[in-house]
Amino acid sequence: CGALAHHIGETNAARNTVRATLLAWGEEIRSGGVDAIVVNASGCGTMVKDYGHLVADDPELADIARQVSAMTRDISELLAELPLETIIDPAPEGRGAVTYHSACSLQHGQKIHDLPISLLRLAGYDVRQPLELHLCCGSAGVYNILQPEMAEGLKRRKLANLEKAGAPIVAAGN
């Protein structure tokens, strides 16, 4: 998707990846064979949804980039539109407790927070949310590589908050 190159400032590499992706997807979209682009990695989803802005100044790619951005959906957005209550058979006693960690790129980049929680509840889970759920876990693309000491502190804080929530399982939209 070009996100990692974009995060480290490799603008040409990112644009080359974005260009190749848009040209390939554009061909498929023009053929009428694409209803949506569904992404299950929130960092890539955020990047692809931003393609329209990233190449807005490129006359060859701007239109298809806007189309791709508009067609791109996080998996939770797609699942929320399906009649899952007719498909999912929740356990009568529930499935237990799960703490939901909302990745920064999902909750801040794509503004998606409640959908994954609703889906987990629909499946029968007792969803718990950690304290400071809005704070970074320390990864942030390549932040953990470029700023390992700062990232380690953020990670420890996030892990402590996840543990305090008390569920044996952590679910993440990434």
Q: Model-flagged regions — what are they?
A:
Residues 1-174:
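Iron-sulfur cluster-binding electron-transfer modules in prokaryotic oxidoreductases
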